[in-house]
């Protein structure tokens, strides 16, 4: 009977796992749990009967009594285990959830350790830091590197859709090229201010840089969600300042429950608030175009660490980890991701430079920030708007690299370079603020 109890408990555990899996609507989570189950050691099937000898002449009554006692003990044990599982389940529901991106980030770190990619990152950091250390005047070099980016001209003849739909743009000063603008699901007149960018020499994956929709325009909001569906965007990183949008303002863009437009509806299936284990608030949406049987999911990640017109001065580790997760997220092979800010330009472009620089480090190479920034700016006008933003792209990638450096000497050198860059970026940001104040006066 004890072996029968073992089998019962095993079936109960499997049933509990199945219920949890069924409750989850996120594909990445289901894959993760399936992987965990497959890695468990297989147990031999329990026998349904216990063979007992009667060589000592034990009476039938004694045997029946013994079996009855065992059944009572087993029943009590099963009830106890069942109550414990209920308590555990209740704790899981009230406690902080571990989301797919959290799992993906931890798995990525584990894979990096096992596969040797950590050594690649350290190799790339070593080469890069040595290059930066040789520069006598690193500040002058950064200023000189940023100048051609800042003065890059936009050919307005290649921005016809932008000029035609200027009323649906956050700013008339952030242009949009026709060649790589986001298209809808085949509709000729579809428009949304977003750009498909790619740097094939670094990654085969493309990334969409987009503005936030106009909150007072139902047409703009609808176009935003149509873009998400048409481009199969499964993850969107929303870059805002901590006090830039309150809860009410944020819900105008991303509904707390359900919202229906003329041609598409969105349903908030789950919200995971920011916590110690989860660096950014995550909103999971079911995005269903009209007359579409499928209900694809999109995850909105609220990255409230980057104030408008400035650069972050804290949470470098959180920012670097978020940047590293853009391409390391477990999304479908034919899906894409998007980086969104108010204009989809300065912050979004700078963050993407940091993302691409991390890709280079993971390949064991020192990134050329100037080349990456020039490429992104040539595809998305006004991407990387200020010198402090340009300098901060170095800080993002070096902070990521620092986490994977084991050599104490290299670690110390990397920390020193980050400190120098941070000081320079903050000084330039203060200078720009003073200039803005003088202009306003």
Swiss-Prot record:
Alphabetical UniProt keywords: Hydrolase, Protein phosphatase
Keyword Hydrolase: yes
Name of the featured protein: Putative tyrosine-protein phosphatase B0280.11
Domain Tyrosine-protein phosphatase, residue spans: 142-400
Superkingdom of this protein's organism: Eukaryota
Biased composition (Basic and acidic residues): 30-39, 80-95
Spans traversing the lipid bilayer: none
Organism whose genome encodes this protein: Caenorhabditis elegans
MF terms (GO), sorted A to Z: protein tyrosine phosphatase activity
Assigned protein family: Belongs to the protein-tyrosine phosphatase family. Non-receptor class dual specificity subfamily.
Residue ranges with Polar residues bias: 50-61
Keyword Cytoplasm: no
């Amino acid at each position: 009977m004890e072996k029968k109890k073992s089998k019962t408990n095993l079936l109960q555990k499997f049933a509990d796992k199945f219920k949890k899996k069924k409750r989850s609507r996120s594909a990445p989570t289901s894959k993760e749990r399936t992987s965990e189950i497959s890695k468990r050691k297989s147990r031999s099937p329990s026998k349904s009967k216990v063979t007992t000898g009667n060589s000592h002449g034990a009476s039938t009554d004694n045997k029946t009594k013994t079996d009855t006692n065992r059944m009572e003990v087993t029943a009590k044990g099963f009830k106890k285990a069942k109550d414990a599982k209920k308590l555990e389940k209740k704790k899981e529901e009230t406690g902080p959830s571990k989301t797919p991106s959290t799992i993906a980030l931890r798995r990525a770190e584990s894979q990096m350790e096992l596969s040797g990619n950590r050594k690649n990152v350290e190799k790339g950091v070593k080469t890069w830091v040595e290059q930066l250390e040789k520069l006598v005047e690193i500040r002058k070099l950064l200023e000189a590197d940023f100048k051609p980016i800042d003065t890059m001209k936009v050919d307005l003849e290649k921005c016809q859709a932008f000029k035609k739909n200027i009323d649906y743009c956050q700013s008339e000063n952030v242009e949009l090229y026709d060649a790589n603008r986001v298209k809808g699901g085949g509709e000729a007149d579809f428009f949304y201010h977003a750009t498909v960018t790619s740097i094939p020499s670094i990654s085969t994956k493309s990334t969409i840089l987009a503005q936030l929709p106009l909150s007072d325009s139902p047409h703009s909001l609808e176009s935003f969600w149509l873009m998400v569906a048409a481009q199969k965007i499964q993850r969107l990183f929303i870059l805002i300042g901590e006090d830039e949008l309150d809860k009410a303002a944020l819900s105008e863009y991303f509904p707390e429950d359900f919202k229906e437009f003329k041609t598409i509806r969105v349903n908030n299936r789950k919200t995971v608030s920011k916590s110690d284990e989860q660096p950014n608030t995550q909103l999971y949406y079911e995005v269903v175009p009209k007359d579409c049987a499928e209900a694809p999911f999109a995850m909105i990640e609220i990255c409230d660490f980057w104030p408008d017109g400035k650069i972050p001065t804290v949470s470098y580790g959180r920012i670097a980890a978020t940047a590293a997760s853009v391409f390391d997220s477990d999304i479908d092979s034919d899906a894409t991701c998007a980086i969104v800010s108010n204009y989809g330009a300065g912050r979004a472009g700078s963050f993407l430079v940091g993302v691409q620089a991390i890709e280079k480090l993971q390949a064991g190479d020192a990134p050329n920030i100037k080349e990456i920034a020039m490429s992104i700016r040539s595809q998305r006008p006004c991407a990387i708007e200020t010198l402090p933003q340009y300098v901060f792209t170095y800080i993002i990638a070096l902070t990521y690299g620092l986490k994977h450096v084991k050599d104490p000497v290299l670690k110390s050198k990397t920390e020193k370079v980050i400190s120098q860059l941070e000081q320079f970026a903050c000084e330039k940001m203060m200078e720009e603020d003073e200039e803005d104040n003088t202009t306003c006066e």
